[in-house]
Amino acid sequence: MSNEIATKEHYMPELNADIIKKYICPAATEQEIYIFLQLCKAQRLNPFLREAYLVKYGNSPATIVTGKETFTKRAASLPDFSGFKAGIIVLSGDKIVYREGAFYTSSESVMGGWAEVYVKGRAVPYRNEVSVEEYEGKKADGSPTKMWAEKRGTMIRKVALVQSLREAFPDAFGG
């Protein structure tokens, strides 16, 4: 295991530019791959476990995305973490409804997401509400990306949860 980092809890494969180019993001530039590699190494993120993604559409700059599970797994290991609730905000008829989870019917519109993160010793949870309009991933033509079109509730719930985790634990998640 020459250049591999292995621990009881986390296995890190050897990552290099060729591996990233071949298996993760063939369209990425050398600079984008280098930055992605450095982030993965510094944060101990394994892209093969979907802890980090390098995403590139057309000629736009690549985007580095840290997977939601990375945040929830790491939060669970923090001594002050006491749980979370997260859900979506839907327009149901003429009413705004806050719903836990990501379920909604075809007659409802997902407007946003919300999350609360509970921290031991803190009376009030860290709470965020986010708008789909602000965060929805879009293609060059302005239409939603496949994930946002197919899993709108799940995606906006993740955004709200990650924001709340970052605010609750800025030292662990970089604010």
Show where each model-derived region lies.
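Glycine-rich anion-binding surface patch
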Residues: 1-175
